[in-house]
Design a protein with these regions (language model features):
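A conserved active-site-flanking secondary-structure segment within enzyme catalytic domains
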Residues: 361-416, 421-424
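Flexible phosphate-sensing "switch/lid" loops adjacent to ATP/NTP-binding sites
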Residues: 2-315, 319-341, 349, 388, ...
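Glycine-rich SAM-binding Motif I of class I
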Residues: 358
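Catalytic nucleophile serine of serine hydrolases
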Residues: 354-355
């Protein structure tokens, strides 16, 4: 079996490559074909646990859309930024310290055999491989070391779509400029342009698509309407970033309801869930289901002013972090540490997840210089020591009896995943003095303070458990499967007739 390969390239980051790749995976899977996604290199702190290690979240969801088992070969190289000038390199699911220390240009030659080897295997096992590019294929300063865009396209003999975000303006210049900067032998791989996020009357685009085709020989094969709530989280950034607590996500997009996995929610709210968006936030996609919970408003905060209006029933969430000590220092610089502790002192609910759990303790100790030593926020009498080896695993566990306001989780079994270096335990001196945190999951996976309002868990994916949403909010959300079908329906409606079939002929 040698797969037909369809590749989604973009004129920029954020053009719509990831969700279009996901939609194509589900479309071809619905035709009865065996489908796999592939992205040679992904730079993201959003990762999921699969057999053999971790891959980018986007490829994980693309695999589910393809009705395939997620596999490290689908994203052989994952770069997880820790600082502005340094990333942790994950090769075939596992951290590679030597590659992490290597300059980027030197790294490319080393990893290319692994990348094309993974792609070759997927092509041999599937009918269709849907490949996602990264950034723009016309980054001419990077072309000599390319391992993710046109080099992959040529290796796979892929039929390429070039997608652009028309809502940003300059879409036709982006498309023409990208095509023009490619060498002639690479231009021929691009078989169609996709205009994404269009608002208004599509007839007003004329005569630009035909003029572009006259210049390049490439037709525009789809004009996709603006669709705020397609149901997938943004891959690279905080979705629906709100400037103030008073500005709801719905207000940013008039007429559009909040959505989690794609469904509607009312515009009124009973509880605000304020997630602190520090610079190295990780696994932010796990909060996507909260966007669809009736009565909940999910907001992202970066300053104390955004927390000024929180009430007793509102939550502050400290999410995961790829640089826990660095993000904790940023928290203090912003004054958010005082805002969090003040909310907790008033009895307000605080939830820490993974790196957020570590921040809530007394101290972070780093003997291997992974994240650096740092004092914690002191809301839980815990100490975290960063180990050299990373814990990467799926985990199922049950909550013990919990005090309010988290009591509705008592006895509930949940599934999730762990990705962390830290090992956390009680602060010995404080425990000896009677100041202890309650372990509310086995093996130190979750802790609660004596007052009950601060809960910390190592598990990512808490809100992806339907039982959690039902217990806390009395809510149900659409299934991922229905979201994937919605994506496929959308592109089937808006692509030109016959195009999707022609891509794999």
């Amino acid at each position: 079996m040698t797969a037909k390969c369809v590749m989604v390239l973009g004129t920029t980051s954020g053009a719509g490559k990831s969700w279009l790749t996901t939609a194509l995976c589900r479309h071809y899977a619905r035709q009865g074909l065996k489908v796999a996604p592939f992205k040679a290199q992904n730079m993201s702190n959003n990762a999921r646990v699969v057999a053999g290690g971790e891959i980018g979240s986007a490829q994980y969801f693309q695999a589910l859309a393809a009705r395939a088992v997620p596999d490290v070969r689908m994203n052989p190289l994952l770069l997880k930024p820790e600082r502005d000038t340094h990333s942790q390199v994950v090769l075939m699911g596992q951290v590679d310290e030597a590659l992490s220390r290597m300059p980027w240009r030197g790294r490319s030659a080393s990893v290319w055999p692994v990348i094309h080897g993974a792609l070759d295997q997927l092509m041999a096992e599937n009918d269709v491989v849907v490949i996602e590019g990264a950034g723009s294929p016309a980054e001419i300063n990077l072309a000599s070391s390319d391992i993710v865009n046109m080099r992959v396209a040529q290796h796979a003999h892929a039929v390429c779509l070039l997608v652009t975000d028309i809502d940003r303006g300059g879409a036709f210049a982006h498309l023409y400029g990208t095509w023009a900067l490619l060498p002639e032998h690479e231009r021929g791989l691009i078989k169609g342009y996709v205009l994404n996020k269009f608002r208004g009357d599509a007839s007003l685009l004329a005569p630009a698509p035909q003029m572009l085709q006259d210049l390049t020989g490439v037709p525009t094969v789809a004009t996709l309407p603006m669709w705020w709530q397609h149901g997938l989280p943004e891959e690279d950034g905080v979705f629906d970033m709100t400037p103030t607590l008073a500005t709801s996500c719905a207000a940013l997009h008039p007429g559009e309801a909040l959505a989690a996995w794609g469904g509607p929610a009312p515009l009124t709210h009973l509880r605000t869930v304020a997630v602190v968006a520090y610079p190295r936030i990780s696994n932010l996609d796990e909060f996507q289901p909260l966007k669809n919970v009736p009565g909940v408003r999910l907001v992202w905060v970066r300053s104390p002013a955004q927390l000024a209006g929180l009430g007793a029933d509102d939550w502050i969430v400290l999410p995961g972090s790829k640089n826990t000590s660095g993000d904790l220092a940023w928290l203090r610089t912003q004054g958010l540490d005082q805002a969090v502790t003040a909310h907790a002192a008033r009895g307000g609910a605080v939830l820490g997840i993974c790196g957020g759990l570590q921040m809530l303790g007394e101290a972070l100790i780093d003997p291997h210089d992974i994240d650096g030593n740092a004092p914690g926020l002191g809301l839980l009498p815990l100490v975290t020591v960063f180990a050299r080896d990373k814990t990467v695993r799926h985990t199922s566990a049950g909550f013990a009896a919990l005090a309010a306001p988290w009591n509705k989780l008592s006895g509930l079994s949940v599934q999730g995943y762990e990705i962390h270096h830290g090992q956390t335990q009680q602060h010995a001196a404080m425990a000896a003095a009677g100041d202890v945190a309650r372990a509310v999951m086995p093996d130190g996976l979750a802790w609660q303070n004596a007052a009950g309002n601060v809960l910390a868990v190592y598990l990512h994916g808490l809100f992806e458990n339907p039982g959690v949403l039902q217990a806390i909010f009395g809510a149900t959300t659409p299934t991922l499967d229905s979201v994937f079908d919605g994506l496929a329906n959308f592109i089937e409606q808006h692509f030109e007739a016959g195009v999707l079939a022609s891509l794999i002929v």
